[in-house]
Structure formats: structure tokens, C-alpha cells
Design a protein with these regions (language model features):
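N-terminal accessory regions of nucleic-acid-interacting proteins
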Residues: 1-67, 235, 248, 271-286
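Short acidic/polar alpha-helix capping motifs at helix-coil junctions
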Residues: 17-19, 94-97, 309
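Short glycine-enriched loop/turn motifs at secondary-structure junctions
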Residues: 36-39, 113-115, 302, 343-345
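Conserved DEDDh/DEDDy metal-dependent 3′-5′ exonuclease domain
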Residues: 39-230
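Mixed-charge, glycine-rich, non-catalytic linkers/tails in nucleic-acid processing enzymes
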Residues: 190-193, 197-299
């Protein structure tokens, strides 16, 4: 599909949601027959929980729901305030206004955001998860992270990526394999944010705010459908596990995530969540495949998240000149190494990957902190 401009968003209706809104669809439709044309959907600005679909507010235990998710705020992180949370459903986009709706509105969304029965399609969930956790006590769970999925697909199809090669959302949208639309307005919004960090706090929301917020989730369900056609069973397992680790990444606490949902693990016959004892959305599709492999002695390589505390004044050594030191560790170990950067935390390094790779990275990074 050739790259095209985004649809004319002026055709979309933008209005409050009636309190009895009941048009929530439980199943995500397949990709449009003509993928060069995306159907327009209404955009609803939500300031009260009663304006959200009941099946979202109270996720049914016997059904699986797939939604698109993104968050906007002031330099969004643990301290950067969440202003808008966007939800893309099959037939509508909901802009959940955290400012006018206050904490009560976001707390009303907590069961859905933590539910294993609602799959949240999101691009790079780490900072969104951090903001939700530290500002609202929400433990984001059951995500389909399109950034992770893209890397797994590239690896499976034989296109090797460098350790720092993370696909941006704009680049993912432009990729004709998944969406094939340009997102020129994203740069305009970034320019406005650089000039005015309070951009997302203004009320009522301007047309460009509404359009930009909606565009960040509009195509996620379509991308999800495309990616599911490319992900093999082994990749789905790694996607489920790594997505859970991404959600935890910046959400550091003192109890080693004891109060978080359990990570997916391999039992004797089934993949289960230790606490819920139910199959997850991704693992259901690979169950039969992996049961056969288990019988043959196969065990998926467990991945972990390790948090390395860096002593004061040592982060420069860890990173190295122009990132050379940390880049060499990534290339040597194959683990994913993440630093907080300007948003922090400034004294920690986060390492995600198979256990052996993570332990090797830990040793090398500790060596760089030593005084000689």
C-alpha cells in the first residue's frame, strides 16, 4: 500500500458521550478490505466514567476485548502529569480527560487497565505505565506492545536490528506492511510541546489537541491485526513476557513487584498466570503448539528485568562517550539496556532479556563503575 496522508479528520464527530452509551463492540474487526481507506469513527471526550462503555469499566470474565491505548501529559513519567488517556475501540475513540474528569475518572479505568481480559495495544508502554503507576497506583497489564512486536517480527524474518534500533511510532505508521500512512502532524505537535510544555493541560481541548490525541490510537487495532498475521507462536510467547517486563520497567518499588500481576510462566501443560489461573490472550493461541514442544523437552527461555543501581558520579562511565560504553555492552550481551535519561530515574540502569544475557550485562556494567 502506498504511503498516503491521514484521513480528513474534520469528518469525525467530536462530542460528549451520552451516559447510556452502549455501542461497545467486544470483537475487533479484521483489517479493512481496502486498506488504503480507513473508516472514520466518532471521537468522544470523556469527563465522567458513566460516558465509558460498561464492558470496559467492568471487564467480563468470559470475553476478551482488544483496545488501543496511549497517554499524553506534561513530560509524561512518574512526576510528569497525565492529562489525557486515549482509548481506541472498534467503533469509537474515547479521549479520557484526566484534568476535567479528575482522579476519580482514571481510577474508574483501573480494572480495565489491570485486567487480563482486556488486551491493550500500545506503542512503547514504559512511560505510560510509569505515569499510571506512580500517579494513580495502576499496574498496567496485558499489553501488546507494537514496538516489541515489530522487533520480534524483524528478527523472525531475518532482518537484524542494532541494539539501539527501536522503531518509532511515526515510522511504524509509515511502514506499508502495517499501515502505510504519513503522520506529518506529529512533528507539528512536538514543536508545540517544545515551545509550550503545558500544551496538553489547556481546556477546552483545541481541535489540534483532539486530532493529535486521536491519531495516536486511531490505527493501533489495524496494526495489531497486521502484526498478528506475522508473529509466530514462539514470538507471541516472548511478546507476552517482554510486554509485562516493559510495564514494570520504570515502576521501581521496594517489594520487587510483589504486588504486581504475575508474569506468564510455563507450567507442566499450560501457560498460566499464577494468580488468575486463566489463559492469557496471547498464550491461548500458542497453547497446542507449545504443549507438543514441552512433551519433547522444550522450555522457552525465561526473560527477566534487572535493575542496577549506579553510584553517584558513575553514570557517565556506564554510558561512555556518545554512548559508546553502554552500546558495547548491548552488542556483547544481546540484552536490552535502558536508562532513564532526562526523565529519570537518574541512578538506575534497567536490563531486560534472557537470564544469562542479563547477568553478563550486569557484570560488565558493574566493571565499568569500578575505580582503577
Amino acid at each position: 500500500m502506498a504511503t498516503s496522508d491521514l484521513p480528513d479528520l474534520s469528518q469525525l464527530s467530536i462530542d460528549p458521550v451520552p451516559s447510556n452509551a452502549g455501542n461497545f463492540r467486544l470483537l475487533v474487526p479484521g483489517p479493512p478490505e481496502n486498506t488504503s481507506e480507513f473508516p472514520t469513527v466518532p471521537i468522544h471526550i470523556v469527563t465522567s466514567a458513566s460516558q465509558l462503555p460498561p464492558e470496559f469499566l467492568d471487564p467480563p470474565a468470559d470475553k476478551q476485548i482488544v483496545i488501543g491505548l496511549d497517554c499524553e501529559g506534561i513530560d509524561l513519567c512518574r512526576e510528569g502529569a497525565l492529562c489525557v488517556m486515549q482509548l481506541a475501540l472498534a467503533n469509537a475513540i474515547y479521549l479520557v480527560d484526566a484534568i476535567d474528569g479528575h482522579e476519580a475518572l482514571i481510577q474508574a479505568c483501573k480494572p480495565a487497565l489491570e485486567s487480563t481480559n482486556i488486551l491493550k495495544v500500545i506503542h512503547d508502554c514504559k512511560r505510560d505505565s510509569e505515569a499510571l503507576y506512580f500517579q494513580y497506583g495502576i499496574k498496567l497489564n496485558s499489553v501488546f506492545d507494537t514496538q516489541i512486536a515489530y522487533s520480534l517480527i524483524e528478527e523472525h524474518e531475518g532482518r537484524k536490528q542494532s541494539p539501539n534500533d527501536y522503531i518509532s511510532f511515526v515510522a511504524l505508521l509509515a511502514d506499508p506492511r502495517y499501515c502505510g500512512v504519513s503522520y506529518l502532524e506529529k512533528e507539528e505537535v512536538r514543536d508545540r510541546l517544545r515551545q509550550d510544555p503545558e500544551f496538553w493541560t489547556y481546556r477546552p481541548m483545541s481541535e489540534i489537541m483532539i486530532r493529535a490525541a486521536a491519531d495516536d490510537v486511531r490505527f493501533l487495532l489495524h496494526i495489531y491485526q497486521k502484526m498478528m498475521l506475522k508473529l509466530n507462536n514462539k514470538s507471541l510467547w516472548h511478546l507476552a513476557l517482554r510486554g509485562s517486563l516493559y510495564c514494570r520497567c520504570f515502576c521501581t518499588n521496594d517489594n520487587e513487584y510483589a504486588d504486581w500481576p504475575s508474569l506468564p510462566v510455563l507450567s507442566a501443560n499450560l501457560f498460566i498466570f499464577r494468580q488468575t489461573r486463566t489463559l492469557t490472550w496471547q498464550l491461548f493461541s500458542v497453547l497446542c503448539y507449545l504443549e507438543d514442544l514441552i512433551a519433547e523437552g522444550y522450555s522457552p527461555e525465561q526473560e527477566i528485568l534487572s535493575i542496577l543501581n549506579v553510584p553517584p558520579g558513575k553514570m557517565g562511565r556506564v554510558i561512555g562517550k556518545r554512548g559508546a560504553s553502554i552500546q558495547s555492552v548491548k552488542e556483547c550481551c544481546g540484552a536490552e539496556i535502558i536508562i532513564g535519561g532526562a526523565k529519570g530515574p537518574p541512578d538506575k540502569v534497567f536490563i531486560i532479556g534472557p537470564v544469562k544475557q542479563v547477568r553478563k550485562a550486569e557484570a560488565l556494567l558493574r566493571g565499568q563503575m569500578l575505580d582503577f
